[in-house]
């Protein structure tokens, strides 16, 4: 009788522990997010140091990888798109070589600079690589990526699933904007795939990795100042509704070139990440549990001369300035504060 009671008690305890382990499959996990390296080999014709430090992108990305490799207990790295200058094969090869130097797995998503621009009679466009070819370069490195697909899912830890999205539209030159279309939309086929993937992973924690945001980051993004409406998805409301339906909490993006910060919309936390290639040149270290997320933003290692050049070129640029970022001391300060975001260099949130 005593033995029977003991076995029953042991069974109950085992079931409780098993349930607990399934509910919280990962206890704490550390990872890094980087974005917009815009790799361009310095010897490439036409590469310069402008707003994007084209001649320095190789060095800046190498330095970042070296620093990331010093982080203890790191599990993986996320790369939020705009991998290259404009999908040049030599730049893809170079980025692959640099990222392969990471000591942990890395996972990429594609940005608007990772597909070939469409030739236009009013603007010469070099023919570079198809986005399917760019994505294919990372098969075997970004787990879950398969031939013929530009988006994928992968279980990066027990019951922690990464879902990457391909947000970019065709790179068609838009004469009235004087720019290639760098906007975003999740097409119907990808939306169906996303819902099926979310449905299959309802009991797991989800991280969405995308280049374009599903939210605007300033009034200029909403009002289409300098074509800034292209910084976030055309069908953002539809995408957010689907993510909310399946209880997604975290969406990580790049593209906007502003320092790390987040918005909470419908209980979803939308994070944006700075570029490695433009001022303020940063990456972000995260620690995550099933209940909360903390982060710390780090500067990319570079010489004082490089930092001075990056800031000088940043301040000289007009296109990236918002409507209230006038070329005055006060306007410059607002411009710097918006991109640097000193109040969000570190933080912690608990999911609702």
Predicted regions and their residues:
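Bacterial N-terminal signal peptides
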Residues: 10-19
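N-terminal active-site segment of His-dependent metallophosphoesterases
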Residues: 24-89
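Active-site-proximal beta-strand elements of phosphoester/diester hydrolases
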Residues: 28-44, 159-173, 209, 269-274, ...
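Acidic/histidine-rich helix-loop elements
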Residues: 35-61, 116-138, 171-186, 222-230, ...
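Active-site environment of divalent metal-dependent phosphoester hydrolases
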Residues: 40-43, 85-88, 110-120, 169-173, ...
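His/acidic metal-ligating clusters that form di-metal
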Residues: 64-76, 161-163, 175-269, 321-345
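Extended active-site neighborhood of metal-dependent phosphoesterases/phosphodiesterases
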Residues: 89-200, 244, 266, 270, ...
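A short C-terminal boundary segment appended to hydrolase-like catalytic domains
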Residues: 289-352
